[in-house]
């Protein structure tokens, strides 16, 4: 009877060791994806969001007691989140200017900033497709889909595909719909 209990205990111990060893080999592979995640939201860092409000205070640190350095005054402006702390997100704009903004002022709606003057929107993701509209540099457009080298934009009642390389607010390898 003693030997039977010892065998069961040994088999259980062996199984537990195998599980621990497997986990130790699997975990580094997951960690090596190169994508950092926020400690608050567990979402990728950096990531793009947009201004939900038409005006938002940008603070030096993540609390109301920190000084306001400036005010973002453009609804739907794309911003890149670079850090998280409680209800605060450290963001930066296209020019690298930024600070801490309360999360309630931000939206997950994807927008981009046009970086090329008279950027043409095409009917299909093809440079030879019919041109639907042209957007001036600095225009903010909503993004509904991105794949490969093109993104589907909506702005001023127009809809069309634009080359991803001419936009700020999406990563080069990013795809979504």
Predicted features along the sequence, with ranges:
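Bacterial N-terminal signal peptides that target proteins for export
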Residues: 2-17
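Second-shell loop/turn segments in exported
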Residues: 62-66
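C-terminal segment of classical bacterial N-terminal signal peptides
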Residues: 19-28
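SH3-family beta-barrel domains
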Residues: 31-60, 71-75, 82-85, 89-97, ...
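Short amphipathic alpha-helical segments with coiled-coil-like heptad repeat character
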Residues: 2, 67-68, 99
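Extracytoplasmic entry segments of secretory-pathway proteins
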Residues: 12, 28-31
